[in-house]
Each structure stands twice: as structure tokens, then as C-alpha cells.
């Protein structure tokens, strides 16, 4: 299966978010470092930049969207799971042109790639509940 430029952008954004969450370094510095050090061939760089910086800037707001639907405290959430959830919630809340089902399915695939063994199930559950609040008409 060919990986699309947008999927690659999402994968890279999750990796950059993970680095940012662990290091708490400047958002722009991590973006520049990531783009300089990673193989960005085949990625939608503009979409990566929007996803990464938009998600990082809105992280506190995105966290508040997911908190009511978490089965554990936010600070007990794994860094990968948090990055994937934040990114998907950014797409759901800020990118109305992305169908909600696409945002959720992409998050599930990211969790399968980067997360713990069954984290995709947890992420799917949180996003399904959160999506109904963010996009009540499921578009």
C-alpha cells in the first residue's frame, strides 16, 4: 500500500510532537531540527508544519477536549498516545475539511504504528466520544 503524503505528514507530526512533549523545547526549534534531520521525501511539508505547530500551540485546549473521555488521569497517558490524540483532535476541531472518519482512522493507524500494542482501541474510543462533541453532525 502506498503511503500518501498526508499520512507521512501525520506520522512525522506525531514524532515531532512526541519529541516536543518529552523535551519541552521551543516548538519552532524542534520543527527545524526535525525537518533537517529526517527524510522528508514524500511528505506534505506544509501539512506537517500546520499539524505539528498547530497541535503544539493548541495542546492545552486539545487536552481539555479529551479529559472527560479518558479512563485515566491525563498525566498517566503515554506520550505516544497523547501525541496521537492531540493530533487527531486538532484535525477534528480545526480542519473541518477533513472528514471526521478520516481523522479517526488515521489516528488509529498512527497508534498501530507508534503506540503500545492495543493503544489503538483506547484512542478509537476516546476519539469517537470526543468527535461527537466537536462535530455533532459527524461530518
From Swiss-Prot:
GO cellular component: cytosol
GO biological process, one term: DNA-templated transcription termination
Biological classification of the source: Bacteria, Pseudomonadati, Pseudomonadota, Gammaproteobacteria, Candidatus Palibaumannia
Gene3D superfamilies the record matches: NusB-like (1.10.940.10)
Top-level taxonomic group: Bacteria
NCBIfam families associated with the record: nusB
Free-text function comment from the UniProt entry: Involved in transcription antitermination. Required for transcription of ribosomal RNA (rRNA) genes. Binds specifically to the boxA antiterminator sequence of the ribosomal RNA (rrn) operons.
InterPro entries in the record: NusB-like_sf, NusB_fam, NusB_RsmB_TIM44
Record protein name field: Transcription antitermination protein NusB
Organism, scientific name: Baumannia cicadellinicola subsp. Homalodisca coagulata
A GO MF term: RNA binding
Family: Belongs to the NusB family.
Amino acid at each position: 500500500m502506498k503511503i500518501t503524503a498526508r499520512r507521512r505528514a501525520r506520522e512525522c507530526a506525531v514524532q515531532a510532537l512526541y519529541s516536543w512533549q518529552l523535551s519541552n523545547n521551543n516548538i519552532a526549534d524542534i520543527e527545524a531540527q526535525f525537518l533537517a534531520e529526517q527524510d522528508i521525501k514524500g511528505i506534505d511539508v506544509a501539512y506537517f508544519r500546520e499539524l505539528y505547530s498547530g497541535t503544539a500551540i493548541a495542546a492545552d485546549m486539545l487536552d481539555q477536549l479529551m479529559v472527560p473521555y479518558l479512563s485515566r488521569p491525563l498525566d498517566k497517558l503515554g506520550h505516544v498516545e497523547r501525541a496521537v490524540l492531540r493530533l487527531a483532535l486538532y484535525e477534528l476541531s480545526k480542519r473541518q475539511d477533513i472528514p471526521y472518519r478520516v481523522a479517526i482512522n488515521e489516528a488509529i493507524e498512527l497508534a498501530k504504528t507508534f503506540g503500545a500494542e492495543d493503544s489503538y482501541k483506547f484512542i478509537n474510543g476516546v476519539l469517537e466520544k470526543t468527535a461527537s462533541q466537536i462535530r455533532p453532525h459527524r461530518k
